[in-house]
Amino acid sequence: MTTKRKLIGRLVPCRCFRGEEEIISVLDYSHCSLQQVPKEVFNFERTLEELYLDANQIEELPKQLFNCQALRKLSIPDNDLSSLPTSIASLVNLKELDISKNGVQEFPENIKCCKCLTIIEASVNPISKLPDGFTQLLNLTQLYLNDAFLEFLPANFGRLVKLRILELRENHLKTLPKSMHKLAQLERLDLGNNEFSELPEVLDQIQNLRELWMDNNALQVLPGSIGKLKMLVYLDMSKNRIETVDMDISGCEALEDLLLSSNMLQQLPDSIGLLKKLTTLKVDDNQLTMLPNTIGNLSLLEEFDCSCNELESLPPTIGYLHSLRTLAVDENFLPELPREIGSCKNVTVMSLRSNKLEFLPEEIGQMQRLRVLNLSDNRLKNLPFSFTKLKELAALWLSDNQSKALIPLQTEAHPETKQRVLTNYMFPQQPRGDEDFQSDSDSFNPTLWEEQRQQRMTVAFEFEDKKEDDESAGKVKALSCQAPWDRGQRGITLQPARLSGDCCTPWARCDQQIQDMPVPQSDPQLAWGCISGLQQERSMCAPLPVAAQSTTLPSLSGRQVEINLKRYPTPYPEDLKNMVKSVQNLVGKPSHGVRVENSNPTANTEQTVKEKFEHKWPVAPKEITVEDSFVHPANEMRIGELHPSLAETPLYPPKLVLLGKDKKESTDESEVDKTHCLNNSVSSGTYSDYSPSQASSASSNTRMKVGSLQATAKDAVHNSLWGNRIAPPFPQPLDAKPLLSQREAVPPGNIPQRPDRLPMSDAFPDNWTDGSHYDNTGFVSEEAAGENANNNPLLSSKARSVPAHGRRPLIRQERIVGVPLELEQSTHRHTPETEVPPSNPWQNWTRTPSPFEDRTAFPSKLETTPTTSPLPERKDHMKEPTETPGPFSPGVPWEYHDPTPNRSLGNVFSQIHCRPDSSKGVIAISKSTERLSPLMKDIKSNKFKKSQSIDEIDVGTYKVYNIPLENYASGSDHLGSHERPDKFLGPEHGMSSMSRSQSVPMLDDEMLMYGSSKGPPQQKASMTKKVYQFDQSFNPQGAVEVKAEKRIPPPFAHNSEYVQQPSKNIAKDLVSPRAYRGYPPMEQMFSFSQPSVNEDAMVNAQFASQGPRAGFLRRADSLASSTEMAMFRRVSEPHELPPGDRYGRATYRGGLEGQSSISMTDPQFLKRNGRYEDEHPSYQEVKAQAGSFPAKNLTQRRPLSARSYSTESYGASQTRPVSARPTMAALLEKIPSDYNLGNYGDKTSDNSDIKTRPTPVKGEESCGKMPADWRQQLLRHIEARRLDRTPSQQSNILDNGQEDVSPSGQWNPYPLGRRDVPPDTITKKAGSHIQTLMGSQSLQHRSREQQPYEGNINKVTIQQFQSPLPIQIPSSQATRGPQPGRCLIQTKGQRSMDGYPEQFCVRIEKNPGLGFSISGGISGQGNPFKPSDKGIFVTRVQPDGPASNLLQPGDKILQANGHSFVHMEHEKAVLLLKSFQNTVDLVIQRELTV
């Protein structure tokens, strides 16, 4: 009858059914593209009981609708409602109300009149609080408020005594009202992705609770009170910072599913064996060294996952698990299996990948039901003959490169025992460790490797591919998690298909080479990069005393690293790629690094580091002396990478590349670095909720800290690196949580202690606050946040927490991009400092989050690590000023002069660029860059002679290529804040530092500049660098030797000024997805390394190259050209920018372009497409800026919206009971048009920043495609609305934290990723700061483009058009900082390789409206063009309206009248657009197909 009634409802005029007309009670108008409620609905107001208006574009509900007194169910999800009319009180019979996925900001107070309401679904709305009247809905049984902006619940919330289901995922809750103990009927409570630092006390009083989600929070302990929940069946505590589980958990007698993945557990309580009903136990991605024997009591256990731990044996009692069906023990250190394993006869899937198995017990043949067995990456020489009994075996994986699931086995006689064994051509297995690396290094083909890597990079950056990569990274985690290098190789080989067909072999080679490389410098670097990335991902616990180890690396090399490597979770495809790049860099760089480092012998470096960084990392931060910090930016970076940063550098081995002072040292260093990386990455990884990438990001970010924070940053970085995993105390990381590094920001006090290698937890607590740590996307911001954290604990923690969540993916690549040779050196220098950390890499490493967590974060970690490293190394650098001193002596970042410098420092680029030491000819290139540009790699490692236009760079001299990158300049600007700062720094600082590798070196330079305006810059300047000028085809025209001195002085002067400020800004920038991910093009890196012929030009070139560098990294095939272009562009741009601009504006521009690191996607995209993107920086920059907002950090903590929840969660544990939460698909559906710009003109502007989530027309798309994290980014994008809200709130928090940082914050023009822009509500909170922040974002853009709207962009607080430095955007930017992480990730996901993003200025005259609709934004419903993009997109244009000939669907709005829409809330964007008077000047990004 219902169908008939629906039909009748549509055929009202038909008299045949007139008799039944009055009986019509249900009308369904779902998916009808309605813009208003159909009038025929009112014809049935007396009888209508159910009305469905799902997925339309309805913006308001007519009053007449509320005359339908009989209405019982009103369903209007996925529309454009901005408010719920008060007349809803007249629907007294309403029982179900669904307003999810709209723009509703609050419930009307008189909702209390709807006494019959039993179900309310209001998820994915920017609701910041519930009215008091809400608690009078006493019949409410189900309440869904996922992905809103709730910071607290009403005190009398306990009045809703009939509540059975309460879902509050992805909000900003820190506590629960005590009255909730009255909710005696509550069965399901979802508090995932919030900001709880401890389990709410009231929880143990809700006795009837059956399902509890507390994942993605900041819990450090699982208290025994949880054992009071006798009815609890499902408990998800994954992605927290839990170090201990209380014995009393055994009280949960009914518990069936226990998810403890991605925490910091070192042991499980014996009482776990009392959970007799347990069917699923997931403890993967922790730091377990053993399992309790009581595990055998879990007789009903069906699924057991203990992958990515440090297990050296399985208890024999495992044989009692007779119900076990799935057993995963990947990435541990098992030398053998217990014979009792054969008693698990029901196991169908068993994965033992990446262990140290040398033989299998005969009893394995008793597992008759075994269908899938993964033995790859072990050391098996053969298989027992009993394998012939496994009749159901369908897949036997013996190698990551295996072409078929089942390869025939032959019977042979064991050479010693003469027993029959099974073997085939894949035996004996070659360990991925040292042996493999060594064996492969001999046959390593740099050219082939480069080509394959480029291909991989391209795939990684493609939108869809990226998605797959991300997924594969997550999926492959179990498979590809191996020793750090193993991971690199294996991850690559395992996921080569995902990355690219040829990826596997190159990776394997890379890994092998890395292993070999530990002996040769270049190899060690490669190995180290790979290992480092892996380690970071793995977050090895013990940060080996890398500082001491940079020299010690050789001793550490190989074995230890191998262990660490195994520990790391499999990197995402991108991570793998990055690792490969790192390996390449290591291989190629070693000679350079060696030479350079030869100048500074390992011992010397260590001594230097030790002397200068006696404090170890903490001291550096304490020292804040720009000079010291900058003196050894490269070394410090290296050390940081190796040690503290290493934790996060794993994904960015190139960045971490230990370009050894000697090849040997390099080799050893690579090993040590790997270990360190592992350790640090572990910490950071653990800390970052999501993934090793995050951890990496944190590390990298930390490192990025520049200037005054530099010393602090060093400490913070170090600590944060360790603390990434270790510092659970970091509470606000809920959002940042995914980014361990971010989350675990070390408090300013702690930062100085870094040299002491604070316990991971100690180190992480504050440093991880760095917003940049959290996300790849917002990596720059994160790091900046970290630095800010050093200066301002509040800010740092917030910033860090936000980015941690969503940015890792992007960051990872970016991080990898720039590792200056000096960085490597810095790693060496850092080694002495790192020495302090436990010699066992595992001890301090907090495990990085599992691949599922978002490996992309790791890249950022890597980058962060370098940042940290450079800081300590800065001291060293003082000794070798020639390299670092350069223009960045003051510590100005290449991109951001003031706040930006710190940010830059945090960036990989900064790390790379900071080591112009003549002794260190090594040019570290971030892995991404390497990957993208063979040239970069080549440059990084003299070994690598790439066929690309860029020639190898001499160790002694850096060749800077002046690439015509005017477009790239914007691209470079986009590329990353890190890069930007270089660019800006360059001109002001003379770009002397430019001698360092552009991406990292610039950051390093920034750091140096910030650290002090000492002679070191001059020393660096003294370094002769070669600048290559590229023709437009990007072919080197010739090398010009240039000295860095010119650059050095200007940077120092300005940078010193911004030393402290920059650190804060840098963090944000680091956070920015684009900024972070915009790795300086290789050339940029080169340009750092080598003074340009024209300092200014060089500076520009460096900055430019950095911008392209991101592109470089992103796009393997057009690496050279993009790099060249970027370089050229940057070279010219800095000249164009006035010093004020450079610092405020230019640096800002760097920041913007750094944000454009996010926007780097744009340049990258252009690079991919071979076009320059300078003209479009604003959009991408805006996006990048949003990406780098620390505010995002908070958001990142809760990266997943209710819908993306499952996707983002780790593995199955993520699955949650069915709920009303909208599905991903639903979210995507909603994406098309969040708001109608015509109606919400004003709102659009603000929200666009937040909602600009939709794919940027070009750069964004590229960016989105870029991230290996694409899949997660997509989820985040979908969550973008939530994120928007969260980011905005976070941004507010960041604002608070970073306001003191505002001087640098203004700089922050951290690239505000679209996601970084806080939602409307949050923007309101942020107030002018936020707007300023947005403005600064645009400003960065603008700087690049020098668009007329820059001032407007910044107009809220300050007109960014004016010098950004004075602008107090920082706080607002800081506010947005948290979002950068997400932005970064999303950016990654969104970057499209299909078209070139073009930016246009459009002027529209209202008549009366604007004539177009928008969707996306932080709190928007997403957009149909680039779901992972949180930007504001045009979805509809009225044919004959004011915008008919100017806009077209798919255009991404970057700015409106100077307001940055990059990470703006949808609602704010709409309000902004509506608020504009007659003329609206838009800066849009349009993706043009090739």
Curated annotation (Swiss-Prot):
Gene3D superfamilies: 2.30.42.10, Ribonuclease Inhibitor
Compartment(s): Cytoplasm; Postsynaptic density
Tissue: Expressed in brain (at protein level).
LRR repeats mapped onto the chain: 23-44, 47-68, 70-91, 93-114, 116-137, 139-161, 162-183, 185-206, 208-229, 231-253, 254-275, 277-298, 300-321, 323-344, 346-367, 369-391, 392-413
Domain PDZ: 1398-1488
Pfam families: LRR_14 (PF23598), LRR_8 (PF13855), PDZ (PF00595)
Bias-annotated ranges (Basic and acidic residues): 663-676, 872-882, 1134-1144, 1243-1263
Quaternary assembly: Interacts with CNKSR2 and DLG4. Interacts with CTNND2/Catenin delta-2. Forms a complex with N-cadherin through CTNND2. Interacts with CAMK2A.
Family recorded in the similarity comment: Belongs to the LAP (LRR and PDZ) protein family.
Name recorded for this polypeptide: Leucine-rich repeat-containing protein 7
Species the sequence originates in: Mus musculus
